[in-house]
């Protein structure tokens, strides 16, 4: 694997290996007074974010630093992109500056793929490119950390029924999770109003439903999504209140879930809209576990791309 641009870059076997790798990193760090491994010493990791981020950017930075990499942050507002430089010129500049890995977030779908095609393969000196979210397309490391969290909470993903609820249309998280969780043997159902489902969703390995209440009693997990108002130019539902009434996870709806079921959210959460504060803070919600797992999972991804299958503590 030269890059991680899409869930399509993974097989079921390689995805499971990454989940296992992340847990090995977690174990390798346990009990260390200084959380530092020499794994990526001498490697340069650059985060290149053209959209705002808290969880993804911070976890990649922490992941790189915990493996002793030199981590450099590049933001659109402080780079020459703000002066009109093209994305290609920026990417080639970062390659020439010695990047071993480029972690890219961009509002345009396909941007990470394009950067990977420009900067070349690692075997000809090009950096590994990791898609940290491209438009409404994909967010593969988010899906991996969600799968890790589900495996830890449920014991296994095979055969589990998992709902992805909310703004499917604008969600790269929904697409990557649908592909990965289905690959790992889960039964995935998308729950959303028709206006928030993408064209072509019938080709996804999922089923579709419009009633959240009808689905909740049969679920093992539910992944709640934020309504991405910043990507909307028109009215996709009558009002926030009506959306919350029909698709928000309230305390009453939480009680409809089986006792073992877990609630996930990729963040940021809009409390009071897609999830009630009491639900967000419930022990049945794994939001902070997702953040912790995000660091270990991104350590695993960087390790696999830059080093390969060796001793994680080495």
UniProtKB/Swiss-Prot annotation:
Purpose: Catalyzes the condensation of carbamoyl phosphate and aspartate to form carbamoyl aspartate and inorganic phosphate, the committed step in the de novo pyrimidine nucleotide biosynthesis pathway.
Pathway: Pyrimidine metabolism; UMP biosynthesis via de novo pathway; (S)-dihydroorotate from bicarbonate: step 2/3
Binding positions (carbamoyl phosphate): 55-56, 105, 139, 142, 267-268
SUPFAM superfamilies to which the protein is assigned, alphabetical: Aspartate/ornithine carbamoyltransferase
Principal EC category: transferase
EC number(s) recorded for this UniProt protein: 2.1.3.2
Name by which UniProt lists this protein: Aspartate carbamoyltransferase catalytic subunit
Gene field: pyrB
Catalytic activity from the UniProt record: carbamoyl phosphate + L-aspartate = N-carbamoyl-L-aspartate + phosphate + H(+)
GO biological process: 'de novo' pyrimidine nucleobase biosynthetic process; 'de novo' UMP biosynthetic process; amino acid metabolic process
Assembly notes: Heterododecamer (2C3:3R2) of six catalytic PyrB chains organized as two trimers (C3), and six regulatory PyrI chains organized as three dimers (R2).
Native source species: Rhodococcus opacus (strain B4)
């Amino acid at each position: 694997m030269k890059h991680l641009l899409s869930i399509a870059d993974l097989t079921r076997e390689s995805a499971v290996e990454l989940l296992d790798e992340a847990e090995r990193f977690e174990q390798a760090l346990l009990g260390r007074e200084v959380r530092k491994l020499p794994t990526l010493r001498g490697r340069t990791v650059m985060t290149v974010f053209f959209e705002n981020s808290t969880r993804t950017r911070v976890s990649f930075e922490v992941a790189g630093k915990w493996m002793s990499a030199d981590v450099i942050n590049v933001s659109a507002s402080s780079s020459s992109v703000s002066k009109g430089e093209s994305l290609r010129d920026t990417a080639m500049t970062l390659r020439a500056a010695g990047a071993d890995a480029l972690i890219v977030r961009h509002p345009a779908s396909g941007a990470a793929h394009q950067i990977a095609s420009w900067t070349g393969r690692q075997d000809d000196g090009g950096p590994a490119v990791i898609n940290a979210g491209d438009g409404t397309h994909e967010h593969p490391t988010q899906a991996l950390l969600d799968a890790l969290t589900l495996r830890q909470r449920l014991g296994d993903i095979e055969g589990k029924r998992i709902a992805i609820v909310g703004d499917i249309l604008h969600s790269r998280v929904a697409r990557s999770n649908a592909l990965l969780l289905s690959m790992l043997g889960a039964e995935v159902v998308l729950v959303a109003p028709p206006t928030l489902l993408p064209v072509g969703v019938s080709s996804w390995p999922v089923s579709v439903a419009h009633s959240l209440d009808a689905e909740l009693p049969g679920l093992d997990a539910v992944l709640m999504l934020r309504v991405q108002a910043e990507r909307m130019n028109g009215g996709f539902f009558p009002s926030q209140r009506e959306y919350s009434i029909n698709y928000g996870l309230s305390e009453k709806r939480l009680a409809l879930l089986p006792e073992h079921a877990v609630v996930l959210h990729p963040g940021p959460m809009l409390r009071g809209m897609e999830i009630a504060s009491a639900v967000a803070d419930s022990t049945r919600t794994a939001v902070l576990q997702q953040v912790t797992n995000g660091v270990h999972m991104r350590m695993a991804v960087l390790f696999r791309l830059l080093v390969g299958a060796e001793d994680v503590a080495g």
